[in-house]
């Protein structure tokens, strides 16, 4: 108790205006209320007596007025009496014209100059009303460069976490056009134009040509090749199925090579997918560059079970383009023919093959307005499942709506149609002619135009005769040796080719134009000693009509379901065909 009295005395000395703390009173068992109040009031003279009795009956001696009671219960506060104006936030606007815009866009009335909205405080649940006001120029008040945000009385009930920025309020609630911020931002960018900017590095994608864009609207093909970056390995342009990178491609073996490039079997390491990589050497000639881009474009846009699937392409710094495509493990038809029994394709295989080629040609022309222009055994591949696919669109030409015919002179001469040789306009029917010639070669095992029909020629001229030279190739395929071939190999080495030289090509072209079309009708198979299939001969004759106006289109030939193509779509020959394809696959291994 002594310690408490000492502390109270020290506190009292700090406040000189207060009287000293009186000593505690010893209260009896029944203390007097008046004495108790006197001790609690510290003996102050200005203390107003209060009654401790809670009963409604008041004593006559200690009665208080109602005004005194109210003053005690609700003490006055200077904060409540103070009349301070609401805070005004000055906000810059776009211009004087922007501030003088009528506010009818906000409230729906031309005389309205403020917006009221309610905001609920998540903590206390109190609804706080706020006012957004703008000085109106319609009432004669000159418009200033500021708008005012008026918050009623005080903002102490607003949750700070729920406060929205002024720009957002003006933009979302009052829909004001804050063009000043865009103006200041543009001014800042103009004034800081010397700051360094990061430019995104442009990558050239060779094959990502949108199929929806017309070729007329796109730029020319030649400048695209010339603008290719001279990097060591440009990124591979891929489809959506695979993400290719040149470092992820592992070469397994070489499949073949030609004048324009080579083909090899590769492995995509991340997916363990086997692919075929075609390397094309870029020539400085714009014609070669156009052919490369055309092949990439066609491969990228074609999606058909009868067309080889395209995975992507890349450009190397050694003037080569790498194309990754689907790998067909059985190879091309010219490699499959020597593996067949009797070096001839069975009739059921020829039916499946013809259906696949005509379906692929129909898809190319009807969907992309494309003619292949180079149908031959080298450009038809087969998988181990017996699926036939068209490839090598290097000399194909994409036709536009205004150009339905092509007038160029390219392709393999042996499979060219008469209208192409004569320099006439040709279309998709030219591929039908090439298909018929290829079927004769696969069915008989002997290349077309190889038989020497001019038996009256002298033997001394057989070395210079193109027919005899072609017959030497036929003898080679049958396992025989030809003296003319041995002499030619001594002169030209392994690069011996039939109809080599201007005279040979001229003889071949003259035969295609002047002689009757080749046929298997009424001919005997030299191996089986039996006539060829009747429907096969009829189908080949329809393909080899010399008058292209009478010759049928691929889709017209596919309509014949009762003769040559009977049972093909129904899968009558599927089991036998797959068994044959497996045998070919085993022979390839």
UniProtKB/Swiss-Prot annotation:
Bias-annotated ranges (Low complexity): 24-33, 92-121, 206-220
Annotated positions of the Phosphoserine modification: 402
Biased composition (Basic and acidic residues): 1-18
Compositional bias per record (Basic residues), positions renumbered to this chain: 185-203
EC id: 2.7.12.2
Active-site residues, Swiss-Prot/TrEMBL: 374
Any single biological process term in GO: cellular response to starvation
Phosphothreonine: modified positions: 408
Catalytic activity: L-seryl-[protein] + ATP = O-phospho-L-seryl-[protein] + ADP + H(+); L-threonyl-[protein] + ATP = O-phospho-L-threonyl-[protein] + ADP + H(+); L-tyrosyl-[protein] + ATP = O-phospho-L-tyrosyl-[protein] + ADP + H(+)
Residues engaged in binding ATP: 255-263, 278
Record's keyword terms, sorted: ATP-binding, Kinase, Nucleotide-binding, Phosphoprotein, Serine/threonine-protein kinase, Transferase
Family classification: Belongs to the protein kinase superfamily. STE Ser/Thr protein kinase family. MAP kinase kinase subfamily.
Protein name: Serine/threonine-protein kinase STE7 homolog
